[in-house]
Amino acid sequence: MGEKWRNEGKGSPAHGLSPRLQRAESALIIFAKAPIPGQVKTRLCPPLTPDEAASLHGSFVLDALERSQEAGRHGSVTVERFLACAPPADHVFFKIMEERHKVRLLRQTGDDLGVRMDQACKEVFALGYQRALLVGTDVPSLPASYYGQAISLLADHDLVLGPSLDGGYYLIGLKRPIPDLFRGIPWSTDQVFPLTRTKAEALGLKTALLPTCRDVDTLDDLLALVNEKGLSARSANALRLLASRLQSRTRT
């Protein structure tokens, strides 16, 4: 997987951000890691090989980028998309995504996920955006309409959350930086969503919820996704191939 991306392009890492698009009111920040074998989807290895997990992750990133294009067609609201890059931020994969999908690159900075999310919010609000949506890439079947729903809900709410079945959340939307929402959260546990709700209540935030979705972290999640509607043809084919390989391995 890594070799494939290295052969397709080259470029320098993202540096300072230029001013926002003149008409853009909302920033959609997609948090993603480079598809490096052994560094992504590690909870799926085994039974997947590191290369298989990296390939699947790359497909999910592409899905998120393609679906997020629909957010820019949400009525009169203009959305600018950012790809928040995890180390190495200068990986050629991200430069290719920037060129092909017309997203702006944003470095993830901070010691834990909460700090990185808070910093990303601060950066886009400092550029003048009125709303910020942060999403991951673990829900490849996420309907594109959810981005528009989140933006609409922020008109009358301080916070929008998209809960996931495992106790986390796949989307968070804000109208201003709220650092306390990201502090003291045990990331990658089933307490992420409930603790965030508790913090929001303590801060007096009016919160709206999107429908609950399943993200893909474990083998059970992966197998459940095989028959799920709404996947891109690319990810559907990749999942069917992986399921077939897993069945063959269990028979040997």
Identify the residue ranges that each predicted region occupies.
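Conserved donor-nucleotide/metal-binding helix-loop-beta segment in metal-dependent transferases, i.e.
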Residues: 142-166
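Acidic donor-binding segment of Leloir-type glycosyltransferases
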Residues: 72-103
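Short phosphate-binding loop-to-helix
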Residues: 93-131, 189-192
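Short aromatic-hydrophobic micro-motifs that form the base-stacking/packing surface
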Residues: 133-135
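Short, glycine-/small-residue-rich phosphate/pyrophosphate-handling segment
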Residues: 179-199
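A short, N-terminal amphipathic alpha-helix
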Residues: 57-76
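N-terminal nucleotide-binding beta1-loop-alpha1 segment
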Residues: 17-43
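Conserved alpha/beta core of the MobA/IspD/sugar-nucleotide pyrophosphorylase nucleotidyltransferase superfamily
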Residues: 198-252
